[in-house]
Amino acid sequence: MGLVVVGAGGRMGQTLIRTIQSIEGAKLVGAIERSGSPFLGKDAGEVTGIGTLGVAITDDPLPVFAKAHGVLDFTSPAASVEFAGLAAQARIVHVIGTTGCSAEDDEKIRAAARHATIVKSGNMSLGVNLLSVLVQKAAEALGPEDFDIEILEMHHRHKVDAPSGTALLLGEAAARGRDIALADNSVRVRDGYTGPRETGTIGFATLRGGSVIGDHSVILADTGERVVLSHHAEDRSIFARGAIKAALWAHGKKPGLYSMLDVLGLNT
């Protein structure tokens, strides 16, 4: 499967380029960067430090998309919306690991999925997506009359959105387990005199610092006991492997908007 990496010069872009080389059935056929990037015109393999691959980095995505089978995208919300539209024009797979998308962004991506096969997830790791299933089951079994749910996440100092896409993914899983809407029952910030905790809400706490790739814990707390479900990312390659797995799974599927739960057969 011929894959294009967008944001090829970034941390995740370089990780994707390296990881593609080790996965059977996947081949790098294009690399995209923004206009004005210092990487334009350079070989994607040389930028990544793995030697010449014969793929030059460009800022003109549509001709590259037209010759590919899929796109791997961990960029920004605005860029991902644009790439979704181009993937729709090219009728190819678009795997989106970008976080921080607004409701309006998601609507535009959903519209593009009429013609592109899009897999979008707040986290591409296989472990996190299994964790989301466990969180949903735990939230359903341990009801709000007894157990409070708090979600704690920590990332490196350079992350620009909060709570993380993974924290929100886990929050949505907990909300499904409780049969409630996360948007109406989440507490994102606590400061000053807040009063007692409101029963049934799902709390979020965000930490930023150092080089932490991603730590997430879902805490279900009752009087006298706590259940903690956690995931710790130790290498960005887990996200790259998951994204490539998603692209290979989506190749040949009909256009639509899918998630990693679909890829893993966990969508019940």
Swiss-Prot record:
The active site is at H155 (proton donor/acceptor), K159 (proton donor). NADP(+) binds at R34. It is found in: Cytoplasm. Keywords: Amino-acid biosynthesis, Cytoplasm, Diaminopimelate biosynthesis, Lysine biosynthesis, NAD, NADP, Oxidoreductase. GO terms for cellular component: cytosol. GO terms for biological process: diaminopimelate biosynthetic process; lysine biosynthetic process via diaminopimelate. It catalyses: (S)-2,3,4,5-tetrahydrodipicolinate + NAD(+) + H2O = (2S,4S)-4-hydroxy-2,3,4,5-tetrahydrodipicolinate + NADH + H(+); (S)-2,3,4,5-tetrahydrodipicolinate + NADP(+) + H2O = (2S,4S)-4-hydroxy-2,3,4,5-tetrahydrodipicolinate + NADPH + H(+). One of its GO terms (molecular function) is NADP binding. SUPFAM superfamilies: Glyceraldehyde-3-phosphate dehydrogenase-like, C-terminal domain, NAD(P)-binding Rossmann-fold domains. The keyword Amino-acid biosynthesis applies. It is an enzyme of class 1 (oxidoreductase). Its EC number is 1.17.1.8. NAD(+) binds at G7, A8, G9, G10, R11, M12, E33, G97, T98, T99, S121, G122, N123, M124. (S)-2,3,4,5-tetrahydrodipicolinate binds at H156, G165, T166. Pathway: Amino-acid biosynthesis; L-lysine biosynthesis via DAP pathway; (S)-tetrahydrodipicolinate from L-aspartate: step 4/4. Catalyzes the conversion of 4-hydroxy-tetrahydrodipicolinate (HTPA) to tetrahydrodipicolinate. Belongs to the DapB family. HAMAP family: DapB (MF_00102). This is 4-hydroxy-tetrahydrodipicolinate reductase. It comes from Brucella melitensis biotype 1 (strain ATCC 23456 / CCUG 17765 / NCTC 10094 / 16M). The gene is dapB.
